[in-house]
Amino acid sequence: MKSVQKISETTQDRILEMDLSAELKHGVVVSNLAYDVAKELGLGEKECYQLAIAGMLHDIGKLKLEGYINGQEQNPMVIEELKYVRMHSTLGYEILKDQGYSDYVLESILYHHENFDGSGYPSNRSGKDIPMGARILRVCDVYAALSMDRPYRKALENDEVLRLMIDEIKNFDMQVFLAFQRVIHKGGNYGIKKETSYRNEAVSYTHLTLPTR
């Protein structure tokens, strides 16, 4: 079975050269959480592993928006809701599509901002028309974004994060959300160890291998 040895050297170097330590940390948190949620849902090890890869790379499209995003850091608007930044999931797909990643990984990244009720982007998919990997990333991405410090606001307490997510439950697959809740209530640590630098954590992820099919 053909495998990808690692993200291409060019892509890896671009990730590590970016002054986006918060984005790197966000990717690690989403990756770890997505793996555990997939496990909780009973998915096989191959799918769980591919979800970990997709979680780490889900925002890689922001590489092409880096200058714009950095210029918006003092803007009180929520960056993820700016129309221009909504291109990042499609851009991420374009960056990775010729690098040997499986359709599972690519579609999870492309559709990770689709909402279960059809109100998301880039294609306004709804329900089971959204790939399972993307439905898992959707929940994990929102949780990680709300529970971590971001350029435009401080991290929220865990109870507040869960309350806000429940208020927006229409965005999520209920089966996935309930599995996510079970994982969170088990008390897993989805941050990065204090003694581990973001760069070192990113290097360990960018050398992961995965089957293309």
PLM region spans:
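Conserved small/polar residues in nucleotide/adenosyl-binding loops
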Residues: 205-212
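Histidine- and acidic-residue-rich, metal-dependent catalytic cores
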Residues: 2-202
